[in-house]
Amino acid sequence: PRYVFVWLPSDYSPKEKYDVLYMHDGQMLFDANTTWNKQEWGIDEVVGKLLNEKKIKPCIVVGVANIPETRYADYFPQKALKNLPDSIVPGDVGFNADNYLRFLVEEVKPFIDKKYSTNKSVEHTFVMGSSMGGLISLYALCEYPEVFGGAACMSTHVPMILSNELSKEKADQWSEAFRNYLDKNLPKANSRMIYMDRGDATLDAYYPPYQDKLDSLMARKGWKTPMWISKVFPGAGHTEEDWNKRLDN
């Protein structure tokens, strides 16, 4: 079982229709008092502010909690493993992203659409996450382009491997496997919205060569602004406080 957190605008009305933003690591979004590191995205404050300023369409935020023990296995783009030799894929991880996405699409979304007044169609449904949550957001867009109209991927963990194993040789191999997956499975260029970003401090300091190669792939496939955006935030690290600061960028 997973907790699912739902944030509604202060003026929510069942007579209106709302876009929906699905976010991973749901327990990290709203309340620093309950998170493991005493940080939060502050997504409720930021989205509320943007709504009050009429900068975004009326929306609901759905935060799907992670299970800490299986987070890496749940968020790793599972079909990218087909591009790796079996000899280097650990047999004890239990990669499970395809089941996680089925849960999101076949259980969570229908429940939200039934319980709340939502715009159900693809152009009103978005997915967002950071780090491994960035990977699973982009993977969700590739696997379910008929469900998600856009993905926001912050500080995406493009080396792919666990941070305590960040050997360059291994990261090069695993990140290439994901790019090969993207090359074959991305939606038609500019048919969906994809946002990616990174900082250059702490864990994000490892990301530039891998994000640059992914950016080059997107350009080669014809993705262009405003449907494709990749940003760098100098000095930014890999925490909820860092991501909060650029939510309204």
Would you name each region that the model predicts?
Residues P1-N249:
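Non-catalytic cap/lid and distal C-terminal segments of serine-dependent acyl enzymes
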